[in-house]
């Protein structure tokens, strides 16, 4: 069991000021100065459980589903074009993906005014905590915990990759957990299609979990970047601290080469960028260290698996399917219970050069699919 204490002290939920709006169809709560307007199928207790640059997340009771859910308010969702596209992408992806180890979409709350809305409310399954919080805590984690977390992450990733999707932003805080140790992957705002050789734009994600091909600006990366991130997360789970906590781009590459060795010419064979190759060739030479000696307390089979995940050349990196079949996960692996996505996800909606109003309308349509009575 993972200890995940939530709610206010003593289990009592505070009552937040609220008013009924739009002819009784909506309730607007004042959550510590944040307006939170949701349909009347959402009822107290309502509790803020997180906040970020995007806005606020509250747990609230969904009377239709008869369960507590997490509702994320994305404030001023259309002020930034890229952020608006991310929101639409995440909604469409979550509606397409249906897997035990991927966070489940419960609702996109329809806005009261179709043309004049600026905030987007997305409801998902409610989880208790995330892997980042668990790693930072002083809670003991057994070998069984670590195996189970890794197995579920890879099981979910197999499904995601089979849908022709690369997550691109795997990190401990994007892996949600409940008290039963169930793990669900979330935050698909940066996800991309898996199209080899297609020029994919550079983007900013958490540097510590970024594969070498991304650090070297390779534009034709594959789902192997997610496997690298899993390797980094795996070691952080075992070691209770980040494996490559680079202060900046250059420092990140240095940390990689100090542990995993300076890339050889064959390691660099995937790179087309001559500037990147020249940069690597002038780096100080480091041999690849034996992970078993650097981390003597870590299970030898776990080290063997991580070693295959942290292969500098992505073409030689272990695949998710191969990782699931590795001896470290033998007691959990069951190919018959590791489903794939029956229909690949289509990113076609992004190819049309859609404008802000189109994005807004598409999000509204997504809300209507889930709430036809508001059409």
UniProtKB/Swiss-Prot annotation:
ATP binds at residues 49-57, 72. InterPro entries: Kinase-like_dom_sf, MAP_kinase, MAP_kinase_CS, Prot_kinase_dom, Protein_kinase_ATP_BS, Ser/Thr_kinase_AS. It is an enzyme of class 2 (transferase). The modification Phosphothreonine is found at residues 201, 206. Residues 43-329 form the Protein kinase domain. Activated by wounding and UV-C in a cultivar-dependent manner; phosphorylated in cv. Pungchon but not in cv. Subicho. The keyword Cell wall biogenesis/degradation does not apply. A motif (TXY) lies at residues 201-203. Its EC number is 2.7.11.24. Its cofactor is Mg(2+). Keywords: ATP-binding, Kinase, Nucleotide-binding, Phosphoprotein, Serine/threonine-protein kinase, Stress response, Transferase. Activated by threonine and tyrosine phosphorylation. One of its GO terms (biological process) is response to UV-C. One of its GO terms (molecular function) is ATP binding. The active site is at 169 (proton acceptor). The modification Phosphotyrosine is found at residue 203. Induction: Induced by wounding in a cultivar-dependent manner, in cv. Pungchon but not in cv. Subicho; this induction is reduced upon UV-C treatment (at protein level). The TXY motif contains the threonine and tyrosine residues whose phosphorylation activates the MAP kinases. Stress-inducible protein kinase involved in oxidative stress-mediated and innate immune MAP kinase signaling cascades. Belongs to the protein kinase superfamily. CMGC Ser/Thr protein kinase family. MAP kinase subfamily. This is Mitogen-activated protein kinase 1. It comes from Capsicum annuum.
């Amino acid at each position: 069991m993972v200890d995940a204490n939530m709610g206010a002290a003593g289990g009592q939920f505070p009552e937040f000021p609220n008013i009924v709006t739009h002819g009784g169809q909506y309730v607007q709560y004042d959550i510590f100065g944040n307006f939170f307007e949701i349909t009347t199928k959402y009822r107290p207790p309502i509790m803020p459980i997180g906040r970020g640059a995007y806005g606020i997340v509250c747990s609230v009771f969904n009377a239709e589903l008869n369960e507590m859910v997490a509702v994320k308010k994305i404030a001023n969702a259309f002020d930034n074009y890229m952020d608006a596209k991310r929101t639409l992408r995440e909604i469409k992806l979550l509606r397409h993906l249906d897997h035990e180890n991927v966070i489940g979409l419960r609702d996109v709350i329809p806005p009261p005014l179709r043309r004049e809305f600026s905030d987007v409310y997305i409801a998902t399954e409610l989880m208790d905590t995330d892997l980042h919080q668990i790693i930072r805590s002083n809670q003991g984690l057994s070998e069984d915990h670590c195996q189970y977390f890794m197995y579920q992450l890879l099981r979910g990733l197999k499904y995601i990759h089979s849908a022709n999707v690369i997550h691109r932003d795997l990190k401990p805080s994007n892996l949600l957990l409940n008290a039963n140790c169930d793990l669900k992957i979330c935050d698909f705002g940066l996800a991309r299609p898996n199209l080899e050789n297609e020029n994919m734009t550079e983007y900013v994600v958490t540097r510590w979990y970024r594969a070498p091909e991304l650090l070297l600006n390779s534009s034709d990366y594959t789902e192997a970047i997610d496997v690298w991130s899993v390797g980094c997360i795996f070691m952080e789970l075992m070691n209770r601290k980040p494996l490559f906590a680079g202060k900046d781009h250059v420092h990140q590459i240095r940390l990689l080469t100090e542990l995993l060795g300076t890339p050889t010419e064959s390691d660099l064979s995937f790179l087309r960028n001559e500037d990147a190759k020249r940069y690597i060739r002038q780096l100080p030479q480091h041999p690849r260290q034996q992970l078993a000696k650097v981390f003597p307390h870590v299970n030898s089979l776990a080290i063997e698996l991580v070693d295959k995940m942290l292969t500098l050349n992505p073409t030689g990196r272990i695949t998710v399917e191969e990782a699931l079949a590795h001896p470290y996960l033998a007691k959990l692996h069951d190919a018959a219970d590791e489903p794939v996505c029956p229909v690949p996800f289509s990113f076609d909606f992004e190819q049309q050069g859609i404008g802000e109003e189109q994005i807004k309308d598409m999000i509204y349509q997504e809300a209507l699919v889930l709430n036809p009575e508001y059409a």
